[in-house]
């Protein structure tokens, strides 16, 4: 049965030559892990590495498996796009710190819609709507 939910990507780990394992915190299911095959290959695939960067807010479609098993993504779509995150060293460092912090804090977190919404709103405010302190 296909499920669709919004999620914040916490991290992704290289799994093989062409695959990654992605961990995210979802609005409806809590912590989820997926294996994404072919995302690192030279051939064109429906998933790109840019769409699975840490702290990306995405909408994912997947088949729900038993707890503890890695699911396969059917589709992923960006909800919030951080335009300057790659090019702004200050925001990039903040994002890396927050991704690592959230990954450790939310390690066993179950579904909690209000916590998800708070984290999402905080990330959008911090990474999207703040200007450089160096300017």
Question: Predicted regions span which residues?
Answer:
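Short, solvent-exposed helix-loop connector elements
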Residues: 83, 125-126
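Residues that form generic nucleotide/phosphate-binding pockets
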Residues: 101, 122-125
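Short flexible/disordered coil segments
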Residues: 71, 126-128
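A surface-exposed, charged beta-strand/loop segment in the N-terminal or early-internal portion
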Residues: 1-117
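Conserved small/polar residues in nucleotide/adenosyl-binding loops
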Residues: 129-135
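Charged mid-protein connector segments
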Residues: 119-123, 131
